[in-house]
Amino acid sequence: MEHTDIFLTHLHSDHTGLAPEIRGKDTKIFIGEKDLSHMPGPHSTFRWADSDDRFAAEGFPRDLLAILTEQNPAQGLSPIPYDGYLPVKPGDVFSYGEHRFTAVHTPGHTPGHMCLWEAETGICLLGDHVLFDITPNITRWMGASDSLGDYLQSLDRVKGLEVAELLPAHRSETGDLRRRAEELAAHHARRIENAWETIRRQPGMTAYEIAGHMAWSIRCRSWEDFPLTQKFFAVGEALAHLDYLEVRGRVTRREKYGKWAYDALTGDSNT
């Protein structure tokens, strides 16, 4: 690793966890500037306790959050604190040997997610932005008012890239980027409608309750049967879709018994 630099597409532990440990003496570690504030270190503004407070305000039971604190691998396997990360801005260029990659900002999965694209060869390192066998998790992020809206715009952004070789971070490495981006956008359009219809049928629910009534692709008979970590992901996904609807005036949020409750406004959920 003495002559190797590291580019982190985003902050999640399965992408960043070992970077500070395997670096060489002169290794540079790059990450999107908007993800940098969430990385463990002196620059971090993220605290798991704050996340728990926000989820509790959305109806997630405190006792289940306490169990998650002990079981959640994202908490137990966070990268070691490191203060040498170098921030990446959209359009930054990385020249190594004969290759010249451009950083493409693709927020949504995380606020600072970055893809690397080389115009000459059409090589594109997608990170977790577009996956071909599974759908990237889109959740609410501190400091981002509309993660899902950001993600949908990012899908449009990569659809315009001329690509020849795709390198996603998980599962299948082959696929049609434009077609898959359109499939992911259609998936979220259906989930937006599902969230809005759920609230319309039963107004005044918390995000935790709304998630329990939404349709999910998981082999469980009921919300009660969901594994706890999957409940956490589902509520985060529900929140991203609720934020999308609220920003566009389709949903309103109010305080109810110390928690946030949601009501649907009239109109088409996809407007």
Residues covered by each model-derived region:
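Residue-level signal for inorganic ion chemistry
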Residues: 170, 195, 245
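C-terminal regulatory/interaction regions
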Residues: 198-271
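Histidine-centered divalent metal-coordination motifs
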Residues: 9-15, 32, 109, 113, ...
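His/Asp/Glu-enriched, well-ordered alpha-helical/loop segment
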Residues: 192-198
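Aromatic/hydrophobic pocket-lining residues that form the small-molecule binding cavity
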Residues: 16, 151, 238
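Metallo-beta-lactamase
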Residues: 74-83, 100-192
